[in-house]
């Protein structure tokens, strides 16, 4: 770790130790969870079905994507011969030959590490959630606080593993590569983002195919309660909560956590180079890199302390207040510690002045997370007028319910983008006094710190999100196992709170994805200009640095239009996948309802068939949607040029954010409008307004849990691909034969991916046509 002073070196080692302690704390909590009671034999039987289905899904998913991960690992290692090491890498390792070897190894290992860490977060998080749900149901028989403790601690395992592994990866790469860290960090971010995309898409399709199928036949047609054991899709629905809301969400936020760190380190290095001497002179001010690492470590410690305050008593029975208390205590500690760290790590050694601007940029991120939290709650909670209006609209049928939800979702996306824009503008104001030569980079560095501040309490955020599916599963197990009324009341209350926490954390996940994408967008400019500057230094004529992108230029405008269209294509394909699989589930549940004795409870449904349908449908889409995310920026960049690729990224960020918020909040509002009616309003359960609300909820399910969340990792994957290929796009001749041939191949792969995603699965046909074991 060259060029670090004694305090900075000590800080980096402390950050490494804290990341390991965070991981250790996660496994300590896991051991506490596993020591809890698993309940009655009937509870363990239902739990066994869920556990088998969840593990089978993730195992099959790993087999599906592992081949692609291995191929991309070798591609990134070989990319060093196309994208040569940076001047920083040559300086760090002493020669171009040594740098080539180290960068090849670094890109491949970092990509593999990012992939494995992201998968580990999803797999372990889901595994602990599955282990926790039956124990929450068992604890509910003892009281409210015991059940709350088990549910929240089960989610805390995922939260602490997310922050521990994310911080560990970034710190290790910096310790090994130093000023050459960006050469490897992009691989780390790309690996995590790609796995998050697979987890989000696969988990979202799985969970909503089962959920939509179970609701349409069970609630609407047969009129039986949710989680009724006679419904053949009920186990697939419960499994889906784990693979979608636990594994998928954990990998998604892990990706944002590491990508904001990656962008902060890349921009911090550029800024640290610019403020000392001249750019490229080998002198760096590394405080801009150390500070983000220290902030992340502070967040880990604050999350651990905050978790200790999540408790309530049998008299108050307020889980939401307990979790909010833990979050706000952690936030207060994190802000205070960040302020205390600023005079230590952000001192200009030349002047002795403390630079408080990074702290204020970080603080704006914490504020942004809280504001988005409240904004999402306003548009999706039963306590506020938007959801009540959607419930009221159900009195005149499902059409007015759906129209009300659509309007609500559209309006909410406007307010969300205004809030995010305000946070970005805050960074502009904070760095308004920065010299013109470094102002652009400094502003974007501030945006990356806003993202770090927003995810400073990732441990608490993930804990609250995972609390939702864990309590939902526990409630389902309690329903199917026939637990007593007191235990059911406890689980009903925790389930209702869990629905709120899931909706709120979705808003934070979307906001963090956009902030991360904007920071990566800034990294795109700095990377392009580094290559252009190197070409100028080599004496190339007619080359200018990329100061801005001219939207009036036809190629840029075309790129902007294509970028704006991609989120719609992605959403269309994921929703269609849910629709196809849900149709198969509907047919299967209808068929099993006709089995003699099943509706009377004398015959057990064949749960495995619905699980198999959902699993097969989810795996079918993974590679094709992954190819779309990787191929489109490559085609745009090499066909239209580097400025057009910048316009393309701007279009992706804008419409991706609007679509993600619209779909998440509209779906959340439809869900809670149904629950508001089920509480006894506008006729209550089994009334005509309730049936209309169930239809609205069913329409909203794939929006809020599949298409909307899948846009988060898609935006970041596309931005990272653009960052990786930017040095080639700048230097290569667009019309050369090699480029034309490569674009034809990429275009063919893209067409195949879209066709593959749209066609009906032969495997699903075979499952539907196969004889059933329960007949």
UniProtKB/Swiss-Prot annotation:
Q: What is its EC number?
A: 7.1.3.1
Give the top-rank taxon of the lineage listed in the UniProt record for this protein.
Bacteria
Q: Which UniProt keywords apply?
A: Calcium, Cell membrane, Hydrogen ion transport, Ion transport, Magnesium, Membrane, Metal-binding, Translocase, Transmembrane, Transmembrane helix, Transport
Give the bilayer topology: Multi-pass membrane protein
Q: Where does it reside?
A: Cell membrane
Q: Which cofactor does it need?
A: Mg(2+)
- Amino-acid positions noted as binding Ca(2+) in the UniProt annotation, renumbered to this chain: 671, 697, 701
Which parts of the sequence bind substrate? 208, 704
Per UniProt, what is one GO molecular function of this protein?
Answer: inorganic diphosphate phosphatase activity
Q: Where does Mg(2+) 1 bind?
A: 211, 215
Quaternary assembly: Homodimer.
Q: What does this protein do?
A: Proton pump that utilizes the energy of pyrophosphate hydrolysis as the driving force for proton movement across the membrane. Generates a proton motive force.
Protein's name according to its UniProt entry: K(+)-insensitive pyrophosphate-energized proton pump
Q: Which organism is it from?
A: Chloroflexus aurantiacus (strain ATCC 29366 / DSM 635 / J-10-fl)
